[in-house]
């Protein structure tokens, strides 16, 4: 579609998350807000009023029992997880979402690092949590019981939660960064940070129907972007509790849109192509793409009819997927669009609550991460680093004044990402400042730039480019069917090197038998690759 600017969307604005929850309960009390699979795959639906009432009741229970400090939340995505988070932050306390897939030692370290005096954990992960004396422990699975207790207090006249005052500028949550280059930092976000980013993002992009939440709630992309934005648009979000159930839940939820990280997109792409190959329909699919693209050029859109099987893999109603959390290859954007599913790439970081930019419904540019959000400022400094300023920028790192001072200067957050903005305002990312390969001749090489070119080949599943003794190495995890095809990759690298300055040319190609180690948001942990090399 032709890139043509169009007006920003208008949305309701709120002082804090508490006002947002109560506002929706009053405005659209009986409209579905969340749904999820329960016993025997029965689907349970909760309205906006149900959610508000449950949050108030659980918050009342917490206040009555002395829970008013820093509360850790550990568990799979669930309705109870959301009730817990909103109850804690909306009573004026601090929520500390913690990844469920960490080790017991790592969880203990984060609980201590965040000064938690209480922890809410689901039964599935209770064995991982060993709390010290003085730290209270509650089960997320028992929240329905706590809600009933809170309701009894409310019916007896307890208004402590409803009347609790929110200071929108104070810390409301601590989100831990994933740590692809080292230890996690605790990012302090306020109500103002989270609600501002939600409003900013909703000005740029319009959700058009029900969604499904597949990203972990302990990350800002999974919680603030996927849940709070959906909440703001007044659609229902189906809660996926496990990545093992994503395909099944898509068929149940039949979403119009969703939010995903690139790994999900890549997995679905490989599954679609693999299925077409196994059923002997790959040529038919490719022919349909050519016909469809030709018809689109003359204004005829038959994608819903031609690629029904592709859409059915996402439930049948899918129109768009907002993608972030890691770089998304341009080839996937174009391929899915040819099938009638729009991938809107965006850019976000935990420290910015998280969204900074996103491609818009009818205004996008392939290869970019979209226009910067209205209400958020971006500056590109001399060395190419992306700086961000706005009400969505964090308060700082918890108990880490040095890191805060290094990255937050005069209100500008130094992202560590490199990029540029084109004449139409689209932001393009080119790599990470810390990942730059600095050669002995003084030349700088962005490994991500080389990786992007290598990843355009369907034989490449994953790749990391790094420096080894002055030589640029491309370590590749091949796609199925290419695991031992070294000649293919040698030829690929020769093609990529052709026409590039000598200092940017890959000297060594390595193939690996297993995927690269990733963090909770499915980003490759680059320092682990370097550790592997040091141990060889």
Model-assigned labels for residue ranges:
Residues 29-32, 155-176, 183, 206-210:
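Conserved pre-ATP/AMP-binding loop-to-beta segment of ANL
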Residues 34-65, 69-78, 82-86, 103-108, ...:
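Conserved AMP-binding/adenylate-forming core of the ANL superfamily
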Residues 102, 119, 380, 390, ...:
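AMP-binding/adenylate-forming catalytic core of the ANL superfamily
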Residues 195-210, 217-308:
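Conserved AMP-binding/adenylation subdomain of ANL enzymes
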Residues 40, 126-168, 272-309, 513:
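ANL superfamily adenylate-forming
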Residues 45-49, 172-198:
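Conserved AMP-binding A3 loop
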Residues 258, 302-427, 433-436, 450-451, ...:
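Conserved AMP-binding/adenylate-forming
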